[in-house]
Swiss-Prot record:
Residues 174-194 are annotated as: Disordered. It is a multi-pass membrane protein. This is Sterol O-acyltransferase 2. Sterol O-acyltransferase that catalyzes the formation of stery esters. Present with 279 molecules/cell in log phase SD medium. Its main location: endoplasmic reticulum. The chain crosses the membrane at residues 215-235, 292-312, 404-424, 442-462, 485-505, 567-587, 622-642. The gene is ARE2. GO terms for cellular component: endoplasmic reticulum; endoplasmic reticulum membrane.
Length: 642
C-alpha cells in the first residue's frame, strides 16, 4: 500500500491522471476542430488540447482517516506547463479514491478517435501535401501545356457535320422501304421510333451541351495591355521630368538606406536563433521547458518585436517604407520562432510523460493490483510513443529530439510556411526555368507597383497631407475634401492591392518554394470568389491563417479555457492589434481606424450567415469586392487626412 501511496502522491502521475480525467477535456490536437469555427460557422468538433502555457491546477487531496491511506480527488488540468496547488480535505470514506480513480479509464476515449483504434495526435490540425498554387494549376500550366489556338470553330463544325450525317441517314431510312419495314421488326421487341427531320411526326434530338471556349488569348492580351500601359506611363514621366527619373519620389523611397535595411534584416534573422539555443539547453538538460524554457522564449518573442520597432523608428530613423518592410518581416520571423519553440516544447512534455510512465510501470506494475492505475500508465506509454514516432516517418535520424539543430531551424526559416514540423513534402529537383519566370514576375510586378504608386497614388497622398495641415474650416468641409480624395485614390489602390497580392503570395512564395523544393504551394485560395468575410479571412493568406488557427485560436481555448466565440474574439482582437501596429509604423500615430474595421469583420460574418444572405452568393460577392475596392483607400485617406 505504501508503493501505491507513493505513486498516487507523485505530481507527475497526478498530472497524467488529470490530463485523462473525464472532466478535463479530450487530450488531442489543439486544432482538431473544423477551421470554420474560427469564423463563427456552424461546425462541430472536439475540444482542443493544450499548448504550453503556464496554468494552475488545483489538486484536492482527500485524506482518508479510517485507514490512513491517501486518495487524491482530481481537479482540472491542461497539457501545458503546470503549477500544482494543493488543498487538503479530510474525508472519512475510502470510496472517494475508488470513485475518482475510475476517471483514469477516460484516457482511451480521450486519446483515440471515437469508434476506432486510431490515435488523436496533437498535430492533426493540418497537413502538407504536394499541390501547385491556384494560378499555376489553373492558368499558367494549362496555358503552357494545352493551348493549341482557336478550338470553338472546330467544335462547331464537328457538331454540324454530325448533325448533317444524322439527317442524311434519316432521309435514307425514310426513302428506303426495306429500312422502314425493318424498323417495325425487332424480333418481337417493342417498335422503335425513328426520328425524322423532314416531317413533324418526330423530333430530331440535337445535343444541346454548352460549348465552352478557351480564353488563353485574353490572358496574353491582358498582360500585353499592362505592359504597353506601363511603358507609356514610363515614357510620359521621363519627358515630363526633363529626361530623368531622379525626381521620382517612389524610386527614392525604394533606394534609400538599402545597406542599413539589409544589415538590420540580417541581424533580425540571426537573432531568431535564440529559440534554438533554448531548445539546445532543454536537450542538454540545463533547462526544463515546462518550468523555465517557455518563459524565456515568450519574453524574448515580445522583446524581439518591440526592440526592432524602436530601433528602426527612434535610433536609425528609417523611412516609412523601410520600417514597414522590417516590421512585417519581424512578424514573420516571430511566428516562425514561436512555432518552432512550442512544437518542440510540446514534445518535451510528451517525452517526459513517457519516461515517467515507463518507470512507474516498471516500479509499480507488480505491486499495485488496481487495473485502472496500470491501464492509465500503459495508455500513456502507448499514446506518447505514437506521438513521438509519428513526427518523422521517412527519416528516422530526425526523430525528436534529434530534430533540434541549427540546420533544422535554418531550413524551416527558408521554407515558405509559418508552421513548424519535422517533415514537409519536397519536390525532386529545382526547375530553374520556373525560378527565372518567378524572378521576372517579381521585378516586373515591383516595377508596375512603382509606376502605380508614382502616378496614381502619390499625388493624392500629398493632397491629403495638405488637407490635414490646412486650416480647420469645419467637419463638413473636411469630410467633403476627404470624399474627393477617396474617389481619386480608389483606382490606384485597387491596382496596388492586386499587384501586392500577386507579388507576395504567388511570385515570391512560389519562387522561394521552388528554390527550397517545398512541395506544398497552397499559399492562397480562390479568395476572389468569396461571398463572405469569413471565407476571405480563411483563404486569402493560408500560411498566416494556419498559424492563427493553431497557435492563437485553439491555444487560447486550451490555455484560457475560452469557448469558441471567445476564442474567435481573441483571434480577431490580436490580429486587429497587429494591423494597427503596422499603421503606427507607417503613419506614426494611433487612430485605431484599421483596428475598428478589422473587428467589424465579426458582425459582417454574422450578417452573411443570416437566412437572407446565405443563398444570395452573387450579392455576397459584390459586397465583398466593394469592401476590397474601398477598404484600403478608406484606411489610407483616413490616416492621412484626420
Amino acid at each position: 500500500m505504501d508503493k501505491k501511496k507513493d505513486l498516487l502522491e507523485n505530481e507527475q502521475f497526478l498530472r497524467i491522471q488529470k490530463l485523462n480525467a473525464a472532466d478535463a477535456g479530450k487530450r488531442q490536437s489543439i486544432t482538431v476542430d473544423d477551421e470554420g469555427e474560427l469564423y463563427g460557422l456552424d461546425t462541430s468538433g472536439n475540444s482542443p488540447a493544450n499548448e504550453h502555457t503556464a496554468t494552475t491546477i488545483t489538486q484536492n487531496h482527500s485524506v482518508v482517516a479510517s485507514n490512513g491511506d491517501v486518495a487524491f480527488i482530481p481537479g482540472t488540468a491542461t497539457e501545458g506547463n503546470t503549477e500544482i496547488v494543493t488543498e487538503e480535505v479530510i474525508e472519512t470514506d475510502d470510496n472517494m479514491f475508488k470513485t475518482h480513480v475510475k476517471t483514469l479509464s477516460s484516457k482511451e476515449k480521450a486519446r483515440y478517435r471515437q469508434g476506432s483504434s486510431n490515435f488523436i495526435s496533437y498535430f492533426d490540425d493540418m497537413s502538407f501535401e504536394h499541390r501547385p498554387s491556384i494560378l499555376d494549376g489553373s492558368v499558367n500550366e494549362p496555358f503552357k501545356t494545352k493551348f493549341v489556338g482557336p478550338t470553338l470553330e472546330k467544335e462547331i463544325r464537328r457538331r454540324e457535320k454530325e448533325l448533317m450525317a444524322m439527317r442524311k441517314n434519316l432521309h435514307h431510312r425514310k426513302s428506303s422501304p426495306d429500312a422502314v419495314d425493318s424498323v417495325g421488326k425487332n424480333d418481337g421487341a417493342a417498335p422503335t421510333t425513328v426520328p425524322t427531320a423532314a416531317t413533324s411526326e418526330t423530333v430530331v434530338t440535337v445535343e444541346t451541351t454548352i460549348i465552352s471556349s478557351n480564353f488563353s488569348g485574353l490572358y496574353v492580351a491582358f498582360w500585353m495591355a499592362i505592359a504597353f500601359g506601363a511603358v507609356k506611363a514610363l515614357i510620359d514621366y521621363y519627358y515630363q521630368h526633363n529626361g530623368s527619373f531622379k525626381d521620382s519620389e517612389i524610386l527614392k523611397f525604394m533606394t534609400t538606406n538599402l545597406f542599413t535595411v539589409a544589415s538590420v534584416d540580417l541581424l533580425m534573422y540571426l537573432s531568431t536563433y535564440f529559440v534554438v539555443g533554448i531548445q539546445y539547453l532543454c536537450k542538454w538538460g540545463v533547462l526544463k521547458w515546462g518550468t523555465t524554457g517557455w518563459i524565456f522564449t515568450s519574453i524574448y518573442e515580445f522583446l524581439f518585436v518591440i526592440f526592432y520597432m524602436y530601433l528602426t523608428e527612434n535610433i536609425l530613423k528609417l523611412h516609412w517604407l523601410s520600417k514597414i518592410f522590417l516590421f512585417l518581416h519581424s512578424l514573420v520571423l516571430l511566428m516562425k520562432m514561436h512555432s518552432f519553440a512550442f512544437y518542440n516544447g510540446y514534445l518535451w512534455g510528451i517525452k517526459e510523460e513517457l519516461q515517467f510512465s515507463k518507470s512507474a510501470l516498471a516500479k509499480y506494475k507488480d505491486s499495485i493490483n488496481d487495473p485502472k492505475v496500470i491501464g492509465a500508465l500503459e495508455k500513456s506509454c502507448e499514446f506518447c510513443s505514437f506521438e513521438l514516432s509519428s513526427q518523422s516517418l521517412s527519416d528516422q535520424t530526425q526523430k525528436f529530439p534529434n530534430n533540434i539543430s541549427a540546420k533544422s531551424f535554418f531550413w524551416f526559416t527558408m521554407f515558405p510556411t509559418l508552421i513548424y514540423q519535422i517533415e514537409y513534402p519536397r519536390t525532386k529537383e529545382i526547375r530553374w526555368s520556373y525560378v527565372l519566370e518567378k524572378i521576372c514576375a517579381i521585378f516586373g510586378t515591383i516595377f508596375l507597383m512603382m509606376i502605380d504608386a508614382q502616378i496614381l497614388m502619390y499625388p493624392v497622398a500629398m493632397r491629403a497631407l495638405a488637407v490635414r495641415n490646412s486650416e480647420w474650416t469645419g467637419i463638413l468641409d473636411r469630410l467633403l475634401k476627404w470624399v474627393g480624395l477617396l474617389v481619386d485614390i480608389v483606382p490606384g489602390f485597387i491596382v496596388m492591392y492586386i499587384l501586392d497580392f500577386y507579388l507576395i503570395w504567388d511570385a515570391i512564395l512560389n519562387c522561394v518554394a521552388e528554390l527550397t523544393r517545398f512541395g506544398d504551394r497552397y499559399f492562397y485560395g480562390d479568395w476572389w470568389n468569396c461571398v463572405s468575410w469569413a471565407d476571405f479571412s480563411r483563404i486569402w493568406n493560408i500560411p498566416v491563417h494556419k498559424f492563427l488557427l493553431r497557435h492563437v485560436y485553439h491555444s487560447s481555448m486550451s490555455s484560457f479555457k475560452l469557448n469558441k466565440s471567445q476564442a474567435t474574439l481573441m483571434t480577431f482582437f490580436l490580429s486587429s492589434v497587429v494591423h494597427e501596429l503596422a499603421m503606427y509604423v507607417i503613419f506614426k500615430k494611433l487612430r485605431f481606424y484599421l483596428f475598428f474595421f478589422q473587428m467589424l469583420q465579426m458582425p459582417l460574418v454574422a450578417l452573411t450567415n443570416t437566412k437572407f444572405m446565405r443563398n444570395r452568393t452573387i450579392i455576397g460577392n459584390v459586397i465583398f469586392w466593394l469592401g476590397i475596392c474601398m477598404g484600403p483607400s478608406v484606411m489610407c485617406t483616413l490616416y492621412l487626412t484626420f
